[in-house]
Amino acid sequence: MIRTVDIYDTSIIGVFATCTEDVVLVPPLTKPEVCALLEEVLDVRVIETLVNGSIVVGALSRGNSNGFMLPYGARAEMQRFTDIPVGILPDRLNAVGNIVFANDSAALVHPDLSDKALEAIARTLKVDVYRGTIAGIKNVGMAGVVTNKGLLVHPKVTASEREVLEKIFGFPVNIGTTNFGTQMLGSGLLANSKNFVAGSETTGPELGRIEEALGFLE
């Protein structure tokens, strides 16, 4: 099975797309064969959309099985989500995909987000929300990937951060990279509990680590 791909001819697929258990959001003009691969491998429905007029859909949105968070000013895109609950992050610090790290049970977010923003995330995604960092990085959304089966994060995650992540999500913390050593591995990985797709530069050992961490090894 093919598990590596480019979107817009680049391997940083997590910047341009994001997925949940049910859907994958991709920018318009994503190649049909790429959409077909994502649909088949991840077992999801493809939605083509801009977010705030931008093609960096993965950097600007974050969702789970309960809904999607979009940035301040993105109400024009809400009409594309007719069957998906959508919330708008009220803060100006709002590259949602970069600053929210979430699955169906919890979310870790940028430590500078306001209480109002945390309330909006909790209400839309229906999860408990916590402020924190991964490897000292505030943009937690790209510093790892979490699904309903596993957790993979930046290699420089600290012991105290590991403890917090394990408590929040209930999984052991695994470390890894994508795209031949990229430590902000969320930029090169789309995953749900059914499967994953990584950027085209991701190596065999990196793919093996992803499989192990996210629960795809028999």
Swiss-Prot record:
Annotated SMART domains: eIF6 (SM00654)
Domain of life: Archaea
One Gene Ontology cellular component annotation held by this UniProt entry: cytosol
GO biological process assignments: assembly of large subunit precursor of preribosome; cytosolic ribosome assembly; maturation of 5.8S rRNA; maturation of LSU-rRNA
Molecular function via GO: ribosome binding; translation initiation factor activity
Signal sequence, renumbered to the chain: none
Keyword Repeat among record annotations: no
Keywords: Initiation factor, Protein biosynthesis
Database matches in Pfam families: eIF-6
Keyword Transit peptide applies: no
Functional description taken from the UniProt entry: Binds to the 50S ribosomal subunit and prevents its association with the 30S ribosomal subunit to form the 70S initiation complex.
Family: Belongs to the eIF-6 family.
Protein name as it appears in the record: Translation initiation factor 6
Gene field: eif6
